[in-house]
Every structure is written in C-alpha cells, then in structure tokens.
Amino acid sequence: MEHNIPELVAQLTLEEKAGLCSGADFWHTKTVERLGIPTLMVSDGPHGLRTQDPERDDPNHSRKAVCFPAGCSVAASFDPDLARREGAAIGREARAFGVGVVLGPAINIKRSPLCGRNFEYYSEDPVLAGELAAGYINGVQSQGVGTSIKHFAANNQEYRRMSASSDMTERTLREIYLPAFETAVKKSQPWTVMCSYNRVNDVFASESRMLLTDILRTEWNFKGFVMSDWGAVADRVKGVAAGLDLEMPGSGGVNDAKIVAAVKAGTLSEAALNKAVIRILNIVFRAADEAAAPAPELDLKGDHTIAAELAKECAVLLQNRGVLPLKKGSKVVYIGGFAKTPRYQGGGSSHINTIRVDSALEMAESHGRRVSYVEGFPADLDQREEEEFLRAVSAAAEADAAVIFAGLPESFESEGFDRSHMRLPESQNNLIARVAAVQKNTVVVLHTGSPVECPWANDVNAVLCMYLGGEGVGAAADALLWGDANPSGRLPETWPLRLEDTPCYLDFPGDGRHVEYREGVYVGYRWYDARKMPVLWPFGHGLSYTGFVYRNAQLTADEFAEGDSVRVRVSVKNVGMMPGKEVVQLYVADCTGTTGRPPKELRKFVKVKLEPGEEKQVEFTLTAQDLSYYDETLGSWYAAPGEYKILLGHSSRDIHATLSVRFSTPRRRPFVIAENTTIGELSKDDRTAAIIQQVLAQAGNALTGGNAGGSEIASSEAVAQMLDSMPLRGIVNFGGPAAAGMITPLLEILRAAIQ
C-alpha cells in the first residue's frame, strides 16, 4: 500500500511529532488515531521471542515460544544459511504473535571472554559476525518482520555499560568494532538499528552524529530508523540532532516536552525532527502492511524440531582420542546435573519462556541406550556433596565410558554483570579430574556461553562443546555423542589457556568511567598469533568423525590491481567413512611491511557438505578491500602495493595451503619527506628506494667508519639495521656527499619522485 509519509508528517502537530519519537510503553510505538497512524510492536530477542503475555501487566512475563541456539552457538556453525534458517523460524513466530520488529541480532565483538553477555554475541572476528548477522536478518525479514541489529557500537562489557566510555583509535573502531554492522547493513538492510548504552570516545552512542548519521547513513546507506536501547537516552535533544529517531521505552512525556521546547527555542531544527518521524513512520507502515497479510500458522512443535536440528550443526568437537562416537550397546554413565537439566540459554532480556527442553538423559533413554545417571554435582550451584561425588566416581569406574555434562550455571554469566574469572565451578573441575583418573574413556560435554579454563583437558579423552544450544540441545547432544550426527561446528572465538593470556586482561573492565582498548586491532586470534602464544583451542578449530584433505589450491592470477579481483580455488575431499561438513577458512597476511598488522586475518569462509569419498572445489573472490586496513592518515581503507599471502585452512592455526599474490595500486599514503625522514622509510617506498640506495652507495666508508665498501653497505645486517632508523640529516653528519650544501637538492629530488 502506498503511504505519503511526508504529507502525513505535514499534518502532525509539533507535539504529535515529538510524541511519535518515543515509545507508548515497553513494547509499542505510539499511534495517532486521527491520521490512521498505527502502532508497531517490538519484541526480544535474538534467539527466540520474549513477547509480553497480553493477559499479564508484567513486562517480563512472556508467552511460550521456542528457544533456538543462542548467538554463541549459531556462530560456531560458521554457516550464514543456518543463521538465515533460525531467523526465518523466529520471523514466522513473530508474525503469528503480531510482532513487527525482533530486537536482534546482537553482534558486538567478543573483546574479552569475561563479558557477561558473550553468549548472545557471535564472535571475536568481525567478518564471521557480519556474515552471520546478515543471514539472520535476511531470514527474519523474509517473513515480513523487521529486525533491530544491536548494540551500535562498541558495547563489549556489562560493567558500567550505561555510562562507561569505550576509548579506542579510529583504526580499531573501523577494523574491529564496526565492520560486522557494516556487512549486515549493506547485505541485509535491517529495518532498525539499536544504539548502545555506552559512550564511544567520550560521546554517548545515542548522541553520536559520527556513528548514527555520518557512518551509518551516509557511508553505509542505512535506510531504516535508529532506536535506543531501553533507557539509553542521556540527552534527548542531542540524540534527535545526531540521528537517534526512537526512544525506548517512553519517558512519560518528559523527553517529548524537551523536544518541543528545543524546536520552539530554535536549538533543534524542526527539519531534524521531521526526518526522524519520517524514518519511524516508514517502518511503522511497512510493518502494518506486512501484518495485513494472513499470518503463518503457529507451529511451535515444528520449530522445536528445527531448533534441535540447528543445535547439531553448532556443536564443536574440541578433542577426541577415539572414544567418540560412543559404541552402540556400550555401558555408559552420564554424570552432572546438566545431563538432566541442561543449560540451554542465557539470562537477561533474551530469556525465553520455552515450550519444552530436551535433556541428553531423556533422549538417551528414549532411544534405548545403556545409560545410567548420577548427578555428581547440581546444575545450578557450585556445591559438592561428598556422597554424590563418590557415587559418581564409583559409577564411572564400572562403566565402559563416562560422559560428564559440565558448564557454567546461569549465576556465573548473564546480562547485567561480567565474570571475574574463567573457571568452571570447583565442584565440577574436581569431579572431572577424579573421574578421569579412574575411567580412561571420559568425555566432557560443555554447556557454556563463553570459553572456560579446562585444567583437566589433557586428562580426558574427548570434549564436546554445545555452547548454549537452545531447547533442543539435549537431542543434539544425544545424536552427536552416539554417532547419529557428525559434529561440524568451529570455534568462533579463541579458547585461551588462562585468563591472564587474554588481550585486554589489564584493561577489562576499566576504571568505571573509561575503558582503554589498548590492545587495538589485536583482538582474539590476532593477539595470540602476533605474540605466538599457545592457546587451549584456536579460533576456527573443530573436529569431525571423518577426515578432509585439501588439494590443488590456486589463484586465477599471480597479481591484480585496484578495481580488479582475483579468485582463489581449492578442492576439499572427504577421506573418511561418514558424511561430514568442512569449514574452509581463508586468511590474508600482509607482507608489504607498510604498517603493523596482525599476522593473518579471516576474510572468507564457506561450509562444505561432503559424502564419503566426495570432492568439491570451492572458490572465493578477493578484492582490494580484502587486503585493506584502515589508514587514519588517509581517513579511508587502504591496501598497500606489494605481496600478500593467501592462507587456506581448517583453523587459524591449521593452514593447509599458502598462496602468494601481488597487488598494485596508484593510491599512496601521504609521504612527507624532510630532514628527519628515515633511510628505512625511503627504502621501503618503490618511488624513492633507488635514489636512496644510490646515496648510500656514494656515502660508503663515511657511514661505516671505513670498515665496508659502498657496495657492501646494504648487505651488512648490522649496518642495515642502523641505517634503517637513520634520518637523512645523519648522512650529512657523517660527512657523506649529501653534506651541508647537498641536503636541499637531495630533498628536492626525493620529493619530486613521489609527486
């Protein structure tokens, strides 16, 4: 249906326009009945609906809905199509419930494993997070329901999240904390974006024109409206001017009155207010038009089945020394409260009132497996009961295998607070160690929203991470443990050996007012690889019950130029006896030496399904953007000319093929040549390298105290290192041919070379 929104806005009073820019309550926008402006209903959350029960006044009492795998699990699938399928199922439920916008996905970068909301977020890597977000958004919006991608931007902790400032360089912001949002906006155009509580470089996100207008709308061409996180508005008038359209929930009219007063006083332009109202009404009427079509039939039972299927794809087999899959008919004891009452979702705004929850124990019994159960430790407490502890150890010793279901209780990680350590409850660690001592076939199944320290990792036979797999997690665990399904998940985040190894250990969570992002772009695997640090399990890691080999990696060209592209091809073969899925990961390494960069960065990935003996060729296309970093001097992305390595592999530390490509570009970084410009800087620039080498050759003995001829100067390692940091004026000081009267002509020659 056609709606002339600008004409409608022209008929609104100033007070009505201000009122439309805030919520009517927790979940609805305001109406203007005289002009036929309807309400828009929004609902949490990213992995299932938390929709207020219309029979209850309590905004936290929600209707029954299906809990799908949380963001931490979806990310482990490395499969944007899986994210799309989850989104589509949530979108169908939203349509049936009358929801116009789903408040998700949540895609903040996992800067530290301690962040209490990491279970809701996707990854430490912006490429992975962005591709999954785009898939999810496309899925939800394919059902005629909008999304609200959140939390924009740099909301990476819960401590003081409503006021702390995330302080970082522009390069760090652009390379790590914004790209996932950019990918999602450009590939899927979410109907709305939710701004975060925090400040970014001392400016509240809700008041940042740079974020909400300059970057989001001007650079990325975002077409929807921006809403606040619940209670995130600091200065409503500044927010409207910056590009914050909708305040949620409403302020009881307080902020509406401030908008009216500011317009009347001339401190806020009515044109800015009109833009906000137009953007809101575009989505309000779009949602109303979609809702006018017949809604799909609500099928919670079918969606539960989908949730369980998705959970199988998201589980990560971290290690396996031959015990998995469990042998059919073997005598197995399940230990741990999570076997009976799994932790399948996180706490906070995304908490879902589920229709049912499968447990691994229930599913094993329903399939007639030879499984016994001993609690060993409770699911929700760090508590050791000696009798139960000893029963578990005894049962493990008598079984063919012991499967311990461990993980973090909700009291350990949730929205609203951060963890202070990475440890599992001591009752769990102690029991795992004791069981492993008496049973060589010990398997640990982890239910957690974020990495944990695993001091017993070398003592157990296998570790299967289910993350927070949704209400079907028990069915998924059962299928994976017993070989009815093959694990294909990969880690979307590095699992460090200990908390002290993490990139922001000294700066998380900050002093309360400011959080210094001193690690810069070295987040996650970028940090561990740059420091060559051992980790427990690397980014991208995940095992299978089958095997894969890579062959015939090749480039379509050995070099390419700005504006062109190059294709990368590699064949992958399943060499095992079971169908499986391999995640081919492509990393880029900058060999130009132009600036400090991580040793490698994920740029592409694809999940490939292969039958036993089947081989498929996968292909990636690379452009200059895939080689680029954000150059603050240029104020834009930049790929330096020179050599780049293309790495293809199974994880960030399991590379199967390395290729080399050269890149050329007419673009150059600004190069100001003066007396203090170093020999090293001039030698690395292909426009000045030959000139400076000639000068060095002429300088000869003067630079080395008579110990080396001019022809040897560049090959002497000690001298080369000294010269690398020597300024041009140093040649003068050593009495070379560029002495006093020659420095000016030399500068002119060098400057002319870079014009």
Where are these regions (language model features)?
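Conserved, compact domain cores that house catalytic/ligand-binding motifs in diverse enzymes
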Residues: 677-744
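Generic non-transmembrane alpha-helical segments
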Residues: 135, 139, 691-695, 749
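Basic/polar N-terminal segments that are highly enriched at the extreme N-terminus
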Residues: 1-4, 662-664, 755
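Glycoside hydrolase catalytic-domain context in secreted enzymes
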Residues: 1-628, 643-648, 652
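Short, solvent-exposed helix-helix connector turns and helix-capping sites enriched
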Residues: 79, 125, 208, 418, ...
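Low-complexity, Pro/Ser/Thr- and charge-rich linker/hinge segments at domain boundaries
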Residues: 664-684
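Globin-like tetrapyrrole-binding proteins
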Residues: 746-755
